[in-house]
Amino acid sequence: MNFEGKLIGKDLKVAIVVSRFNDFITGRLLEGAKDTLIRHDVNEDNIDVAFVPGAFEIPLVAKKLASSGNYDAVITLGCVIRGATSHYDYVCNEVAKGVSKVNDQTNVPVIFGILTTESIEQAVERAGTKAGNKGAEAAVSAIEMANLLKSIKA
C-alpha cells in the first residue's frame, strides 16, 4: 500500500506562527503561505496566524497550537540572518530542534519555513524573488503532510 498526501486544502485548518523580527522578509513569507493555502482551497477563515517576537519563540507557540487539537498543520515562518557573532548558530540550531521536537510530541505536521541565510540578499531571494517563496513552499508541504497523516489514520 502506498500513502500519499494530496494537495487539496478543502476542510483543512492551518495555523501559521510567524516571527516579527526581520518582518520585511517574514511578511513576504506570510503572504506567500496564505496565498498558497487559499489557492489550494483552504478557507481563509481556517487560517490562523500567531505573531511572535523572534525565531527563538516559534517552537513554544507552535507546540501550543499543535497540541490544541484545532489544527491539521502548523507552519512556522521566520528569518535568521548571519551576523558578526555566534548568536546566529545558536538560534538556528535551537529553533530547528524545537520545531522537530514539536512534530515528535504532537503528531501534527509542523512545517519548518524558517530562513537561515548568510545575507539579507539571500533572504530576499527566498522570500519571493529569484529563489521562489519559501512561505509558499511551506504551505504546500503543510497541505501534503496534513492529508498524508489523515490517509494513514484511515
Curated annotation (Swiss-Prot):
Stored SUPFAM superfamilies? Lumazine synthase
Provide the residue positions that the database annotates as binding (2S)-2-hydroxy-3-oxobutyl phosphate.
Answer: A84, T85, R126
Q: Which GO terms describe its molecular function?
A: 6,7-dimethyl-8-ribityllumazine synthase activity
Catalysed reaction equations from the record: (2S)-2-hydroxy-3-oxobutyl phosphate + 5-amino-6-(D-ribitylamino)uracil = 6,7-dimethyl-8-(1-D-ribityl)lumazine + phosphate + 2 H2O + H(+)
Q: What is its EC number?
A: 2.5.1.78
**Alphabetical UniProt keywords:** Riboflavin biosynthesis, Transferase
GO annotations of cellular component type: cytoplasm; cytosol; riboflavin synthase complex
- List the InterPro entries: LS (IPR034964), LS/RS (IPR002180), LS/RS_sf (IPR036467)
- Presence of the UniProt keyword Transferase in the record: yes
Give the multimer and partner information. Forms an icosahedral capsid composed of 60 subunits, arranged as a dodecamer of pentamers.
Q: What does this protein do?
A: Catalyzes the formation of 6,7-dimethyl-8-ribityllumazine by condensation of 5-amino-6-(D-ribitylamino)uracil with 3,4-dihydroxy-2-butanone 4-phosphate. This is the penultimate step in the biosynthesis of riboflavin.
Name of protein = 6,7-dimethyl-8-ribityllumazine synthase
Q: Which species does the entry assign this protein to?
A: Staphylococcus aureus (strain NCTC 8325 / PS 47)
- Per the record, the gene is ribH
